[in-house]
Amino acid sequence: MVRSRTIKRPPQQDRSRVTQERILASASALLEQRGYAEFTLQKVCKESGLSIGAIYSRFSSKDELLRTIQEKHIEELDTDVMQIVRKLAAQGDSLQSTAPAVVKEFSELYRKHQSLLRPLMAIAAMDPVMAQEGKKFDTRTKQQFRHLLLRHKNGIKHPNPERAVDNCFEVVFASVTHVLGLGTAPNVMGTAPNVRSKGIWRDFVEDLSQMVSTYLLSEHSGISKGELVALNAERRAGR
């Protein structure tokens, strides 16, 4: 059974809040620079210039500190996702322009946050609480991705637009996280160092955008929209 997240109440005094933010900033920087393998509370003390007692007075364990880092980072990610949604929704436009824009914006989101996402995703593979929070973020992100593309549902040529958009999200997410080496140690993913070149990353995102656009805008053989409607009606009737 996955235990619920148990984080202490936020500090009420300004001085205490500043100290907590200092701990979180130092711990996040250490995690980004050294990864989880070299992450210890002793090193957080050295990085922040605070005592181990100051840390334990605010976080009961290393796990709680890491979960709080993830919580704050997900808040930042959620904010960035909503900025993307507002930006693209305001532009309106057609599916032809929206599809590549959505792929590019969400790809850049993960690239922007890769240095902290990488260790946090690796830790989440071992921590069920962090894994659960990560899945919740993925679900929210997928919903926004779907919202932006399904606004142009009538322009999607696939007989099942919802399924097509879901497939696009899974492909984009899997491709981007693989290329950026998210959820793995930096020396495990052979492709990750390549994206340090802006040109290679740009080409990758352009190609990924083109693949998604072509998939959504091209006619698909097989079951027709009419056949799909009839099939769905039969399924609902059989429930």
Language model: regions and residue ranges:
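Short, basic, alpha-helical segments at the C-terminal edge of helix-turn-helix-like DNA-binding modules
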Residues: L41, E71-D78
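C-terminal peripheral helix-coil segments that are non-catalytic and often amphipathic
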Residues: M1-I7, K142-R151, V165-R239
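Short hydrophobic clusters on alpha-helical segments that form packing/core surfaces
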Residues: I23-L31, L77, F106, V172
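Secondary-structure edge/capping motif, primarily at the C-terminal ends of alpha-helices
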Residues: I84-Q91, L117-A124, H152-K153, V179-N187
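Hydrophobic alpha-helical connector segments
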Residues: T68, Q83-K112, V165-F169, A233-R235, ...
